[in-house]
Amino acid sequence: MARSKSSGRWLKEHHSDVFVLKAREEGFRSRAVYKLKEIQEKDRIIRPNMTVVELGAAPGGWSQYVAGILNGRGRMIALDILPMDALPDVHFIQGDFREETVLNALYDIIGEGNYVDLVISDMAPNTSGIKSVDQARSMHLVELAADFAQERLVAGGDFLCKVFHGAGFDALFQHLKTQFSTVLTRKPQASRARSQETYLLARGFIRSAE
């Protein structure tokens, strides 16, 4: 089967991408680590002794980076529908985040009555090529991640998620502003310029009295 022009362009860009080359040199699993690294250097969202949950973790670049900062002091819990090779100090769950059994497995690892300090999500759906469908699927995943964050974040905790500009973006932004002290947008240099992706960083979760 002949490659499409877009896939050929992606392969050419990928093999010459400075962040791909840098990830190989520095031993990271993906170029995406530099998106999180830039946000961390600017906003200092990851600190030792934290419990961090990553949604959409495979192939593991973000979890690898977070575990390095925690350095054995704290907990790194990662989840993805795809398999992921084991990483030191990372507890990985393979399963579909949309399924209740998988979500319950995540709750079990966190522990009953326990909260987490940071939720990070780089989840994205498989694309269909139909923009409106892909946007709806993407926003559904983001909303599920936000629901989880609001259920399990400690008061003052932070939530970082990948979002694509389009239908639902403004509503999500406004909703997060009611749940967190501050909501910021971040477009790291490692995010390809033509991509519609951006990151929302919601800081200072406001936990209501239970």
UniProtKB/Swiss-Prot annotation:
Which GO molecular function terms does the record list? rRNA (uridine-2'-O-)-methyltransferase activity
Q: Which GO terms describe its cellular component?
A: cytoplasm
Pfam families linked to this entry: FtsJ (PF01728)
Has the keyword rRNA processing been applied to this entry? Answer: yes
Residues the entry annotates as binding S-adenosyl-L-methionine:
60, 62, 80, 96, 122
Residues of the active site are 162
- Keywords per UniProt: Cytoplasm, Methyltransferase, rRNA processing, S-adenosyl-L-methionine, Transferase
Keyword Magnesium assigned to the entry: answer is: no
Instruction: Say which domain of life the source belongs to.
Output: Bacteria
> What are the EC numbers?
2.1.1.166
* Catalytic activity, reaction form: uridine(2552) in 23S rRNA + S-adenosyl-L-methionine = 2'-O-methyluridine(2552) in 23S rRNA + S-adenosyl-L-homocysteine + H(+)
State its role. Answer: Specifically methylates the uridine in position 2552 of 23S rRNA at the 2'-O position of the ribose in the fully assembled 50S ribosomal subunit.
To which protein family does this belong?
A: Belongs to the class I-like SAM-binding methyltransferase superfamily. RNA methyltransferase RlmE family.
Under HAMAP family, the record lists:
RNA_methyltr_E
Q: What is the recorded name of this protein?
A: Ribosomal RNA large subunit methyltransferase E
Instruction: Output the lineage of the source organism.
Output: Bacteria, Pseudomonadati, Pseudomonadota, Gammaproteobacteria, Cardiobacteriales
Q: Which gene encodes it?
A: rlmE
